[in-house]
Amino acid sequence: MKEKTAPKKTWLQTLRALWVPLAIGIVTVTALALVVGAVWQDYRTALMTSQTRQMELVVQSTADSIRVLLEEYADRLDSIAEKVAADAGLRPTVARSDTIRDVWLENSNGEVVYSCYELSAVCDVLITRTEKISYWQYHSGDEHYLVMKKQAGGKTVCLVVDATVMYQQLISEIHVGTNGYIMIKNDDNLVVMHPEAVQWGIKVVEGRQRIYKDRTLDLSSLSELLRAQQEEEAGTLDYYSYWWTDPSLPRVHKISAFRHLKVGDSFWIVSAVVDYDLSLIHI
């Protein structure tokens, strides 16, 4: 007696038999991908929060250090100015330090009529004028100087600070990310200190357009950042700009953590800048 043969599966049954486990596999993989994606997004968010917090702490510490130094210089300048005001013929002296380089006297025309150590430098730009003290940027060769001035009778006492050394000691050795840096601007977006010496004393937007006039620069995002930094005392913002320390001038997504540094009745802006993507790798 012949055995009955099993009925052959139709192509639809075969397709269904293949697609059911395949569909289950696809759903499983998709679910895993969603879970992994959610976990990665949570990790990325947590990492970014941690990194920006570190940047904020770096900016706070830097601003505090600069404030202490400026107060020390202001006290030194006040002391010298009081002596000059009391004795019109006084030829003031100052003890040199790592950053204090000289003391000058200027006449009513702004001409240096006395220099304790005979240091000469060229005046570049007024950085900040407060009620009692004005802050100026000078240079001599590759050296930049912060010159703090105060009226004393018919003369102006000038304390000459080596801003290049000040930047090197307080700021340039601080590592922010793999290629980040710290810069300082005044309340009118004039660069006070920057890792690129050519940018000292220039306006952040207009000066860079002049320096890189052979390049077509999109500084719209940077301009928005500057407006926000003027209005807010501290914060962390992302924007698009260029790596000014890279000769190829690549346009990148950046993060800036910033804080106002009070200077008399004005302020400077201390800003830490890193590459947005690289900041997720290392700070």
Where are these regions (language model features)?
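Extracytoplasmic/periplasmic ligand-binding sensor regions of membrane-associated signaling proteins
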Residues: 106-173, 178-181
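Juxtamembrane extracytoplasmic/periplasmic/luminal helical "stalk" adjacent to the first N-terminal
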Residues: 11-89, 99
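Non-catalytic regulatory/interaction regions at protein termini and inter-domain linkers
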Residues: 1-15
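Conserved beta-strand cores of small sensory beta-sandwich domains that regulate signal transduction
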Residues: 78, 102-104, 181-183
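Extracellular/periplasmic juxtamembrane segments that couple receptor/chemosensory ectodomains to their
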Residues: 151, 155, 213-281
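Conserved beta-strands of PAS-like sensory domains
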Residues: 141-175, 186, 192-196, 253-259, ...
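Solvent-exposed, extracytoplasmic
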Residues: 86-99, 156-212
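Extracytoplasmic/periplasmic sensor domains and loops in membrane signaling proteins
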Residues: 111-141, 199-245
